[in-house]
């Protein structure tokens, strides 16, 4: 059996706002409440479970999403409409740029708790696969 990611917890300063921000930005269905979590289903049977950091400092994480060219255009348009800062690199040095790694496009931006979100149209290391 192949191992698949099923869900991960995304600690947030305001999980309700963070889950709705994420779902809206990515064009996904509204979050569903499940116990203390606000779940956003991202596809491929994977769920992001937004949870309050409980007053503790949120440890910033990186979440990368492989999207189609059309999805990239749609998500990136929402990033721009919301006037979010974006970068071509995870070090946030190339502001306002899009990377072109492996013949695709990629961009990084932050969510409401500071997590670094990334959308890419080609998986890294994808030469010869696309």
What are these regions (language model features)?
Residues 1-16, 63, 122-130:
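N-terminal beta-strand motif that seeds the catalytic metal site of vicinal oxygen chelate
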Residues 2, 9-48, 52-54:
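Core segments of cupin and vicinal oxygen chelate
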Residues 65-112, 116, 124-130:
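Vicinal oxygen chelate
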Residues 44-47, 56-57, 68-73:
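Short, charged/polar surface micro-motifs in flexible loops or helix N-caps
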Residues 7-9, 39, 62-64, 106-108:
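Short aromatic/hydrophobic contact patches that present stacked aromatics
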Residues 2-4, 56-60, 100-101:
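Short glycine-enriched loop/turn motifs at secondary-structure junctions
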Residues 29-34, 91, 121-124:
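Conserved catalytic-core motifs of GNAT/GCN5-like acyltransferases
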Residues 48-51, 108, 117-120:
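Conserved beta-strand in the GNAT
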């Amino acid at each position: 059996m192949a191992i698949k990611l099923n869900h991960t917890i995304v600690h947030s300063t305001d999980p309700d706002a963070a889950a709705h921000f994420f779902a809206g930005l990515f064009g996904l269905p509204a979050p569903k409440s499940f116990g203390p979590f606000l779940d956003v289903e991202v596809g491929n049977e994977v769920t992001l479970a937004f949870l309050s950091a409980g007053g503790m400092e949120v440890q910033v994480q990186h979440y990368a999403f492989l999207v189609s060219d059309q999805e990239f255009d749609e998500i990136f348009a929402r990033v721009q409409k919301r006037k979010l800062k974006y970068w071509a690199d995870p070090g946030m040095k190339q502001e306002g740029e899009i990377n072109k790694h492996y013949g695709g496009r990629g961009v990084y931006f932050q969510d409401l708790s500071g997590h670094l979100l990334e959308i890419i149209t080609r998986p890294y290391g994808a030469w010869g696969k696309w």
